[in-house]
Amino acid sequence: MANPKLVLAYSGGLDTSVAIKWLQERGYDVIACCLDLGEGKDLDFVKEKALKVGAIKSYVIDVKDEFANEYALIALQANALYEGKYPLVSALSRPLIAKKLVEIAELEGAVAVAHGCTGKGNDQVRFEVSIKALNPDLDVIAPVREWSWSREEEIEYAKKHGIPIPVDLDSPFSIDQNLWGRSNECGILEDPWAAPPEEAYELTASLENAPDVPDVIEIGFEQGVPVTLNGKAYPLAQMILELNAIAGKHGVGRIDHVENRLVGIKSREVYECPGAMTLIKAHKELEDLTLVREVAHFKPLIEQKIAEVIYNGLWFSPLKDALVAFLKETQKNVTGVVRVKLFKGHAIVEGRKSPFSLYDEKLATYTSEDEFDHQAAVGFISLYGLPTKVNSIVNKQNKSSVSTGQ
């Protein structure tokens, strides 16, 4: 009788390489799945490594465009920053990874999927909730959470089974990267008082090493979608990668954040998101120009909720779908060009224009070209302030009655 098949989210690192053997020992034929999310890793090597370790099949799927257009774009249009800081680098990729795991499992007739998450992180929740939303019949196995080995025990197991030990195993940092940015934790970063060492960064220059001359760029949007960079059309994934290089050179997008994890603990994380933070800044400025006041004031409430929903692993949920429906409605007129200066860690918006601009210079100016009806302000103020006036009159009358004993 053939062994049951299982699809493993495979990174090529020690944990998921050991997981292949560990799952085989429990009777599974393991199919490895690795996605190209724009992290720049040699994925051909990863594919071959999975097969050498013992996987019966190894998938490597380029999902950069899908990730950019269907995941990162929603976060961008929501100006999504979890707790006002974190642009959801890892949180955005997990539902897409889960989706591909399920698709391959269904294609291959697998009975289960597996991931390499520990028992104290957010990703285990994001993966497992997403998988159950997409196919509740699949079993989900978390080998690292189950085996509870020390690092030394895991290395010993790897040596015993001929599993290659990664050359970067001595690095104190735990890193996750995709085209939307790079996250870094562990090592000295676990001390919230300790300054992150420069070796913790890869995508961004320090302020000391950033150029002394700024770059000024222009980003074009159509209905909330970035479409041009300096007048040249780009697919979104490529534009993000271009901005990672340009803005990263100037030290834009470094984030040092103590965040509240879904599992109830606080965690100190260091992020590098030069492209994401530049795009969010430009997009928000274009919205300021094109959204009516009521929408502009209400949308941040939705943005905060979308960020929480994504962070908390509820991508495949009715709530997220409803929030995104509102979000899409707000983007119809978010078309135009934003000029941004990149310099010494800052993305500074210097100009914005749009055919849907609600800024009317003839109404805003204080020159002789002013067309604002100043006399209309008298009636407006009277009506606007009427509830406050009535409240004051009533309070004074009652205060007078109390003081006279009436």
Swiss-Prot record:
Q: Name one GO biological process term.
A: L-arginine biosynthetic process
Q: In which pathway does it act?
A: Amino-acid biosynthesis; L-arginine biosynthesis; L-arginine from L-ornithine and carbamoyl phosphate: step 2/3
Where it mainly occurs, coarsely classed, is: cytoplasm
Which residues take part in binding ATP?
A9, Y10, S11, G12, G13, L14, D15, T16, S17, G116
Give an example GO cellular component term for this record.
cytoplasm
Enzyme Commission number(s): 6.3.4.5
Would the keyword Chloroplast turn up in this protein's UniProt record? no
Molecular function (GO) terms for this protein are: argininosuccinate synthase activity; ATP binding
UniProt keyword terms in alphabetical order: Amino-acid biosynthesis, Arginine biosynthesis, ATP-binding, Cytoplasm, Ligase, Nucleotide-binding
Q: Which InterPro entries match?
A: Arginosuc_syn_C, Arginosuc_syn_N, Arginosuc_synth, Arginosuc_synth_CS, Arginosuc_synth_type_1_subfam, AS_cat/multimer_dom_body, Rossmann-like_a/b/a_fold
Sequence positions that bind L-aspartate = T118, N122, D123
Q: Which SUPFAM superfamilies match?
A: Adenine nucleotide alpha hydrolases-like, Argininosuccinate synthetase, C-terminal domain
Subcellular localization(s) per the UniProt record? Cytoplasm
Give binding positions for L-citrulline.
Answer: Y86, N122, R126, S174, S183, E259, Y271
Under the heading Gene3D superfamilies, the entry gives: Argininosuccinate synthetase, chain A, domain 2, HUPs, Single helix bin
Reaction(s) catalysed by this chain's protein: L-citrulline + L-aspartate + ATP = 2-(N(omega)-L-arginino)succinate + AMP + diphosphate + H(+)
Q: What class of enzyme is it?
A: ligase
Q: How does it assemble?
A: Homotetramer.
UniProt-listed HAMAP family = Arg_succ_synth_type1
- Return the PANTHER family for the record: ARGININOSUCCINATE SYNTHASE
Which family does the UniProt entry place this protein in? Belongs to the argininosuccinate synthase family. Type 1 subfamily.
The protein's name is Argininosuccinate synthase
**UniProt organism field:** Geobacillus thermodenitrificans (strain NG80-2)
